[in-house]
Amino acid sequence: MANPRDLIPSATTPAPLAGVRVVDLSRILAGPLCTMVLADLGADVIKVERPGEGDDTRHWGPPFAGEDAAYFLSLNRNKRSVTADLGSPEGVSLVHRLVATADVLIENFRPGLMSRFDLGLDDLRESHPRLVTCSLTAFGADALETASRPGYDIIVQAMSGLMSVTGERDGEPTKAGVALLDVITGLYAAVGVLAALRERDATGSGRHVSVALYDASVAAMVNQAANYLIGGIVPGRLGTAHPNIVPYQSFHAKDRPFILAAGNDRLFARTCEVVGHASWADDRRFATNEARVVHRDELIPLLSEAFAERRMHEWLALLDEAGVPCAPIMAMDEVFSSSEGAAQVEQIDDPVRGLLRLVASPIRFDDLAPSTRTPPPTLGEHDVEVRRELEGGPDP
């Protein structure tokens, strides 16, 4: 089987969004992730940044490669960078000229700020009816009390309920280990933009897409939100355990913890056989998942005692042989030492920063996979190139 990283666009398999131009006024994570998804799919993304400073994430290190933080590099491949001071007539003029050539404009300023820059989205779409615009906000432009509040991921993790269900049962609320809600919001925004482009191609008219970090975050609560809305259950923290499935959590073997995911009664019965207690599957307290959820505090200590008798690799081998989903809990070095993790790494020959190793796009098509056409840009790297394009002159 071919390595997915070898399945790259060619002259006969152009990238799906080839020919689409995106003006990217976003920064930090959610917006840049959205535009990176579009760039990976072939769009020409022009990232507009503040002169001398650029996207804040350029400075969110160490570690750094060259002058830019790894954080920035993880979100900005396949883009071009131009600098523009939106507080100056020249900067605003540049954005207007870019928009005149664009299919999509994406921004994540606080509500109302684009109009202060003389870049009101309604005015832009009136001048360019085919333009798709996308705003990523913290709480939505219409939120009465919170519209102007900044939307850092950790703030919304706290306000959306995510932190209330994350952490050990008797511990403090804990944030997720990555800015997961920014990632989810960026993906929702990309879906919305793609849908608006599809509609634009059919009708000839663009549409405004709006995604609020808070809204996407509450939507991401899925079953936990439904447990409350339907059952009136205020969920709490369960560590690695699942509120609706038992056993579905980490257990500590003799040497280290691992994950067990017995997602149905059949898998639970197999687990009981593996640990040498087949009778547990017939115990009325544990025979069904509903019963196991009710009697969680009786079952988990029994399983914990059994799993403490062997080393992790022994249990994983036995569970895997029985067809029970299980996995080691891996650190980053273990992830990228595994065959699966290594296959997701792309090596990029960056003429400024040297050889970069970054995580590649996870999207696969039957005959291609998005690849890094260009490394993440240095600040203002394409100032001359893009301005010459707008003037109709040759590339430098």
Tell me the role of every PLM-derived stretch:
Residues 85, 167, 210-212, 261-262, ...:
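Short linear motifs in exposed loops
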Residues 45, 82, 209-211, 326:
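Generic structural signal for residues in well-ordered beta-strands
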Residues 141-142, 170-178, 201-217, 236-243, ...:
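Conserved Rossmann-fold dehydrogenase catalytic segment
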Residues 70, 217-219:
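Substrate-binding strand-loop-helix patch
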Residues 79, 153, 182, 204, ...:
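Residue-level detector of functionally special positions within alpha-helical transmembrane segments
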Residues 154, 188, 209-217, 263:
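NAD(P)-dependent dehydrogenases' Rossmann-like dinucleotide-binding region
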Residues 1-52, 108, 127, 132-134, ...:
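Acyl-CoA thioester-binding alpha/beta core of soluble enzymes
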Residues 1-192, 196-202, 378, 382-396:
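N-terminal helix-loop segment corresponding to the beta1-alpha1 unit
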